[in-house]
């Protein structure tokens, strides 16, 4: 069937620059397409600048591209139409470039699959405008999650560079971008194919370096066309198949960072079920928010819950900055907590304080005197630091007997070498790998991560930051740390230290 240009709703050029292809205005006599589900529907995200698909006026005549659909701005799948090198949704908004021939090449390889294309390119943007909190990133992530409900995400196609800041290169931004996508889409090995930059040798050099440094990533030379992208993508599919079962740790785990409603009757029972599903032998709860006892009655409930699971579920204790005015006052409280079973202090938030604020120093010194390791949180409003984290180093130097466990945004300093330097200089510093963002940082450059973990294998702690909000999630949606650490190529001896031995030694379990 051939469609005329007049049968397509045509939009102005200015609108085409803003909205992706395939707006949800369909033919009057058409019906919503029936798509195959799951493994038979292969979905690709098309991101970056418009090199893959440049906006053009719709051709006079178009033909359906069988087994190929486009995702509209409203999240609806529409039949793809083609005319030569042009591809268009049934609602208008033609694009030209390598994408049509990519789709045709992928369809030719396997007659049993259908292709879904999610075009979220951004004209006239550079790589710096694809940060995790930008509109471009959020729109692409949302579209990717929407598409994944209907099919199987099989890869990302990217064209674009143009970093302007002297602090971070294209390579820095691209590594972070794709690790963020892989983490947020829960596909740690999602293939990525990038087009090299025909007008920038420096950008092309960095794109090639990215393909060398980052797993499941390839680059395509200018002029390779859609078939070149297809060949690169198919090669990654062979090297990084997505139908393999997720590897499982075969070492009993210790997780020193979870959150449970231990102050409520039966509040630790869900923890036990979660531990059994995930092969966790022992864990430590951290009292945050509503899980921290508010009165003597809740405290007694918490202590009773932990007595029930003594030797299996341990606990941190907590004093908030400002709740005590002297080291002596803090020591008295912490000694009582330790006598009642606390094995550490945390999660220390330090709301609206710099990391080395005097109110925080009271707590660090008291923990050093009592012998409780401190697990801290860092972000833009808690225990705040600058680049280089000199404030954290100052505390480590002031209290060498205080064992301090890094968490949260501390890990964001891994790529620039700060984390490596700090662990090398300060024997009282440890780091737990809990939290979603930490998975992204560690998956960003697996070669560097592997070297880092091997170098500091005695002071890295496996942890998840799981909580009452996640204990009942199915195994397929559990924390990604379980999957990632089995894919890093670490030796059994190193994994054993990270999975359990380091925590056992630090908290005195063995």
Q: Residue ranges of each PLM-predicted region?
A:
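Cell-envelope and extracellular/periplasmic
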Residues: 29-239
């Amino acid at each position: 069937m051939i469609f005329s240009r007049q049968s397509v709703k045509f939009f102005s050029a200015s609108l085409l620059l803003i909205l992706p292809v395939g707006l949800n205005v369909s033919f009057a006599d058409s019906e919503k397409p029936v798509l195959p589900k799951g493994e038979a529907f292969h979905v690709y995200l098309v991101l970056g600048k418009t090199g893959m698909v440049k906006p053009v006026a719709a051709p006079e005549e178009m033909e359906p591209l069988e087994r190929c659909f486009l995702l509209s701005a409203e999240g609806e799948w529409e039949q793809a139409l083609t005319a030569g090198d042009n591809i268009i949704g049934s609602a208008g908004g033609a694009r030209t470039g390598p994408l049509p021939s990519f789709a045709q090449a992928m369809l030719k390889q396997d007659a049993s699959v259908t292709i879904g294309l999610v075009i979220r390119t951004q004209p006239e943007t550079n790589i710096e405008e694809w940060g995790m909190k930008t509109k471009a990133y959020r729109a692409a992530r949302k579209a990717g999650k929407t598409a994944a409900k209907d099919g199987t995400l099989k890869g990302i196609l990217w064209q674009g560079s143009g970093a302007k800041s002297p602090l971070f290169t294209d390579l820095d931004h691209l590594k972070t971008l794709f690790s963020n996508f892989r983490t947020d889409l829960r596909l740690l090995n999602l293939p990525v194919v990038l087009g090299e930059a025909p007008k920038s040798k420096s950008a092309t050099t960095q794109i090639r370096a990215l393909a060398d440094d980052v797993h499941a990533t390839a680059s395509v030379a200018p002029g390779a066309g859609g078939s070149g992208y297809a060949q690169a993508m198919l090669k990654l599919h062979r090297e990084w198949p997505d139908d393999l079962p997720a590897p499982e740790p075969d070492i009993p785990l210790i997780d020193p960072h979870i959150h449970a409603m231990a102050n409520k009757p039966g509040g630790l029972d869900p923890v036990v079920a979660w531990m059994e599903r995930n092969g966790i032998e022992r864990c430590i709860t951290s009292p945050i928010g509503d899980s921290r006892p508010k009165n003597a009655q809740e405290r007694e409930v918490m202590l009773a819950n932990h007595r029930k699971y003594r030797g299996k579920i341990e606990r941190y204790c907590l004093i908030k900055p400002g709740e005590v005015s002297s080291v002596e006052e803090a020591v008295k409280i912490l000694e009582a907590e330790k006598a009642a079973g606390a094995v550490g202090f945390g999660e220390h938030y330090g709301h609206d304080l710099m990391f080395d604020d005097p109110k925080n120093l009271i707590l660090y010194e008291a923990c050093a005197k009592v012998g409780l390791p401190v697990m801290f949180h860092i972000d833009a409003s808690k225990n705040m630091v600058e680049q280089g984290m000199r404030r954290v180093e100052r505390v480590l130097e002031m209290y060498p007997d205080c064992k301090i466990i890094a968490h949260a945004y501390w890990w964001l300093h891994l790529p620039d070498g700060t984390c490596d330097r700090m662990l090398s200089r300060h024997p009282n510093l440890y780091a737990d790998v809990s939290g979603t963002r930490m998975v992204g940082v560690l998956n960003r450059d697996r070669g560097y991560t592997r070297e880092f973990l091997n170098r500091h294998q005695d002071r890295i702690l496996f942890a998840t930051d799981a909580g009452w909000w996640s204990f009942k999630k199915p195994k397929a949606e559990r924390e990604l740390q379980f999957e990632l650490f089995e894919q890093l190529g670490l030796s059994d001896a190193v994994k054993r230290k990270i999975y359990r031995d380091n925590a056992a030694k630090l908290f005195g379990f063995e």
